[in-house]
Amino acid sequence: HLGKILMKKFDLNANNQPQTYAIGIKELWEIKPENHTAGKIVHTTGWPLNTDTYGGSFLYHFDKNLVSIGFVIGLDYKNPYLSPYDEFQQFKHHPQIKKYLDGGRRISYGARALNEGGYQSIPKLTFPGGILVGCEAGFLNVPKIKGTHLAMKSGMLAAEAIFEDIDKETEIIKFQNKIKKSWLYKELFLVRNI
């Protein structure tokens, strides 16, 4: 990743805690109309994981009988035989989840690594010629498993800071202050140390 190269080159992690990571697996399902409730949200933690393994799930009912279901597992798990994919499959067979998926069909799927360090892992965000935003900056609200709104806000604040200093050929340090004064920073502070 370019971000990791930049963080090392400009020592952007000098004053923050190390980033932690998880793997997120997500599927999109088309389910039976009788199993669908538009707008319904289900979040879980734990099962089928053991008590030493951090993780949880989400299930979001969209319109047109579509459901997004996902499972996130912290990558610091101790069991070398643990398979995030297998844990996700087991999770989908829990009666409280299976009832939504029965008779449905999976339309798409994907997986990705997630930054989960949160507030205490936010690096220095600026360096000569650039700014870290979104996921690269570690902006993720872990309990809500949401980061798109934070990525968008950081991009907007970056644009403002760049616009204000576009004629200067210096590091845009204003951006870090804009982040610290924004609701983004407050939101991450409230869910720190999770």
Predicted features, each with a name:
Residues H1-D102, G138-F139, S154-L157, A161:
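Predominantly flavin-linked oxidoreductase catalytic cores and closely associated redox partners
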Residues K99-G110, K168-K174:
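Flexible, glycine/charged-enriched surface loops at secondary-structure junctions
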Residues N16, N79-L82, S121-K124, V142-L150, ...:
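Alpha-helix capping and helix-loop boundary segments enriched in small/acidic/polar residues
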Residues A111-V142:
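FAD-binding beta-loop-beta segment adjacent to the flavin cofactor pocket
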Residues F71, G134-E136, I179:
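Active-site proximal loops enriched in glycine and acidic residues that flank catalytic Cys/His/Asp
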Residues G138-K144, M156, E160-I194:
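Active-site-proximal substrate-binding core of FAD-dependent oxidoreductases
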Residues E27, I31-K32, Y109-A113, N177-K186:
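Short, conserved secondary-structure transition motifs
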